[in-house]
């Protein structure tokens, strides 16, 4: 292992935060923009988002939802109707107050004092309130329910400390909003969408997650219940990768979303909302990346196979290109994971080794080099991103299949890469969860022994509320810890709460988090 020369100069073990930024740069995913806290998502990064979007959109539509689009501007009065909701977002809201600019007489521009809006407009931080207005118009009777909608959009939350893909002032996401006749139906739908997120994360992104309910202090502003999927990054921190909220009638009462039931009575709807964002890409980086850059699971890779002809600006280049074109033509007729194999023939000029490492850093699942000798021998030089190195020689672990062999095996190879990435991440996650913690002192010692990657701790607690919960939160805050969620389908605890000493009623995960 010591004689392997990795592609990145910054190593995960040395500086995880710097390594994360290096992967984004070297994989050419995104860059900082001229607007503080906002990023430019570049073609490879946006291609990954498009794959995530397509796969998740199919799952959302399979559960009966239809896509809509609402304005990015929301009247301030919409938020004022829901006090708890606006309090949760007030410090992050960007507000438009004028509709015109004028010259300042010195070559600059200023808002025109005569063009002040009658009512300020909030730049969308989330859309419960504006969806609520529409639901109040669209829903009249029980026949209009359930109303199942989803929106793909950008949102703005003015963050003070930003990090690309994890926390930016503007980001891309989907947000679902639904209305139901009863609490039971709405709660069931909340969990249905949580399961959609779990399946998407694990099956498409190869991210092992824990699904569960958030504690009272971590609920979405205005929600009755908030559920999340939590993933463990390679530094042991938790990443909240998606949330699903049961909102009760809180937003319905604020927006007057009512329906006439079968008996002719008038009732408030029970609503839900749920969302995931480009934060998922940050999760992919920190779960699967290594000291050679990004590794993209095949299901979300814009290109699953990249073919690199070793062109030398010689007459034989034409024959080599034809050989590569023929290989590409055969591969794209094959199906893998229910879709045609996505193949790029990279004909850009450049040295073979430089182009290879460019695609290794980007995380393309399979990189194929084809030179004149490969063509003469009727083979290709294949490199799997998940099996990059020959441990004994310290050199790239090239394989040499024939085009026919590759065509026959491409689907199973991509399946193997996808399954292997999930398995590796799941094994690592499970190995870094501490169970059997029976006291707060034991928890404190676990996070105070100087280890870099201490993972999560599973503990029993009594589900305190109010001031008692606030004391727990403060004790954890001193250790830079938070309660992640209450995992679903766990056996009933038999011990005592490590925070209050009372009989435990639930298991929870505690961790440092992004």
From Swiss-Prot:
Coiled coil: none annotated. It catalyses: tRNA(Pro) + L-proline + ATP = L-prolyl-tRNA(Pro) + AMP + diphosphate. It is an enzyme of class 6 (ligase). Keywords: Aminoacyl-tRNA synthetase, ATP-binding, Cytoplasm, Ligase, Nucleotide-binding, Protein biosynthesis. InterPro entries: aa-tRNA-synt_IIb, aa-tRNA-synth_II, aa-tRNA-synth_II/BPL/LPL, Anticodon-bd, Anticodon-bd_dom_sf, Pro-tRNA-ligase_IIa_arc-type, Pro-tRNA_ligase_II_C, Pro-tRNA_synth_II. Gene3D superfamilies: Anticodon-binding domain, Bira Bifunctional Protein, Domain 2, C-terminal domain of ProRS. One of its GO terms (cellular component) is cytoplasm. One of its GO terms (biological process) is prolyl-tRNA aminoacylation. Its main location: cytoplasm. GO terms for molecular function: ATP binding; proline-tRNA ligase activity. It comes from the Bacteria. Its EC number is 6.1.1.15. It is found in: Cytoplasm. The keyword Lipoprotein does not apply. Homodimer. Belongs to the class-II aminoacyl-tRNA synthetase family. ProS type 3 subfamily. Consists of three domains: the N-terminal catalytic domain, the anticodon-binding domain and the C-terminal extension. Catalyzes the attachment of proline to tRNA(Pro) in a two-step reaction: proline is first activated by ATP to form Pro-AMP and then transferred to the acceptor end of tRNA(Pro). This is Proline--tRNA ligase. The lineage of its organism: Bacteria, Pseudomonadati, Pseudomonadota, Alphaproteobacteria, Sphingomonadales.
């Amino acid at each position: 292992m010591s004689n392997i020369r990795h592609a990145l100069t910054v190593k995960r073990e040395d500086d995880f935060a710097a390594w994360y930024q290096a992967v984004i740069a070297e994989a050419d995913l995104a860059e900082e923009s001229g607007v503080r806290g906002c990023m430019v998502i570049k073609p490879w990064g946006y291609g990954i988002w498009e794959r995530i979007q397509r796969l998740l959109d199919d799952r959302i539509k399979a559960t009966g939802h239809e896509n809509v689009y609402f304005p990015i501007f929301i009247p301030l009065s919409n938020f004022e109707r829901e006090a708890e909701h606006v309090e949760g977002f007030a410090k992050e809201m960007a507000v438009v107050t004028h509709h015109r600019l004028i010259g300042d007489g010195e070559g600059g521009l200023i808002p025109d004092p005569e063009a002040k809006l009658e009512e300020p407009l909030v730049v969308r931080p989330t859309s419960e309130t504006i969806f609520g207005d529409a639901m109040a118009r669209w829903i009249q009777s029980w026949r209009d329910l359930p109303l199942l909608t989803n929106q793909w959009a950008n949102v703005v939350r003015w963050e003070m400390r930003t990090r690309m893909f994890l926390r930016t002032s503007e980001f891309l996401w989907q947000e679902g909003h639904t209305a139901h006749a009863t609490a039971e139906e709405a709660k069931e739908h909340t969990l249905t969408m949580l399961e959609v997120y779990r399946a998407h994360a694990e099956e498409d992104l190869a991210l092992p997650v824990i699904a569960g309910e958030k504690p009272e202090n971590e609920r979405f502003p205005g929600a009755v219940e908030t559920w999340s999927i939590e993933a463990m990054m390679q530094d042991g921190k938790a990443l909240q990768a998606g949330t699903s909220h049961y909102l009760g009638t809180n937003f319905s009462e604020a927006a007057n979303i009512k329906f006439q039931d079968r008996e002719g009575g008038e009732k408030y709807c029970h609503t839900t909302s749920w969302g995931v964002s480009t934060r998922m890409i940050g999760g992919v980086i920190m779960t699967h990346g290594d000291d050679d850059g990004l590794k993209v699971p095949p299901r979300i890779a814009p290109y699953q196979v990249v073919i690199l002809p070793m062109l030398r600006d010689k007459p034989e280049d034409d024959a080599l290109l034809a050989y590569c074109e023929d290989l590409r033509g055969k591969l794209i007729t094959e199906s893998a994971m229910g879709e045609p194999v996505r193949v790029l023939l990279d004909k850009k000029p450049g040295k073979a080794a430089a182009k290879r490492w460019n695609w290794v850093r980007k995380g393309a699942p399979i990189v194929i080099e084809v030179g004149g000798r490969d063509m003469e021998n009727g083979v290709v030089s294949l490199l799997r991103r998940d099996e990059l190195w020959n441990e004994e020689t310290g050199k790239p672990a090239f394989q040499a299949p024939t085009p026919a062999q590759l065509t026959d095996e491409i689907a199973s190879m991509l399946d193997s890469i996808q399954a292997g990435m999930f398995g590796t991440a799941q094994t690592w996650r499970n190995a870094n969860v501490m169970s059997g913690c029976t006291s707060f002192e034991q928890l404190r010692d676990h996070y105070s022994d100087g280890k870099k990657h201490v993972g999560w701790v599973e503990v029993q607690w009594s589900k305190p509320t109010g001031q008692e919960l606030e004391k727990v939160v403060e004790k954890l805050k001193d250790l830079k810890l938070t309660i992640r969620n209450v995992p679903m389908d766990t056996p009933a605890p038999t011990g005592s709460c490590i925070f209050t000493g009372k009989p435990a009623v639930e298991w929870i995960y505690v961790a440092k988090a992004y």
